[in-house]
Amino acid sequence: MKNYILFSFLVLIGFGASAQKFAYVDTEYILKHMPEYKSSLSQIDGMSQQYQKQIDESFVEVDKMYKAYQADQVLLTDDMRKRRENDIIEKEKKAKEMQRLKFGPDGELFQMRTKLLKPIQEKIATAVSEIAKGKFIDFVFDKSSESTMMIYASTSYDLSNDVIIKLGYKPETTIK
């Protein structure tokens, strides 16, 4: 009976002592190896510049209207003045609305960014998951995430190169 209790105690200690395995990846490092990421960023940047140009042109037009109004203000009747003021205000509202529609939290640029980058993120997540399952790893942290603070991590726990290889790229070559 004593042996049975001792054996049970040792078995329970053994289960409690089985440590969980941790690893980490550096998604910024992984993304630098993916040509589709660079291509997506180029598309997003191009669209951003195009939108910004349209918005800048709208605000330049508002500025021109305002300067013309200031120059003509003395010569205008009250009705004409109010009409021009309303035109300027309306044009400025439209420019601000365009800015919100293009760059706002639910704007076209945000939607485009999500559409282009989500498949890349899912591809990385799938590769990380497969590698972690294959190596019996319980938790994988992202070293490049601002919410994960890693003061020290041994490179032996870094799965980044494994992920790059799993995705079909070479770890020693980055996309420029």
Give the predicted meaning of each segment.
Residues 20-176:
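Amphipathic, charged alpha-helical segments and their helix-to-coil junctions
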Residues 4-15:
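Sec-dependent N-terminal signal peptides
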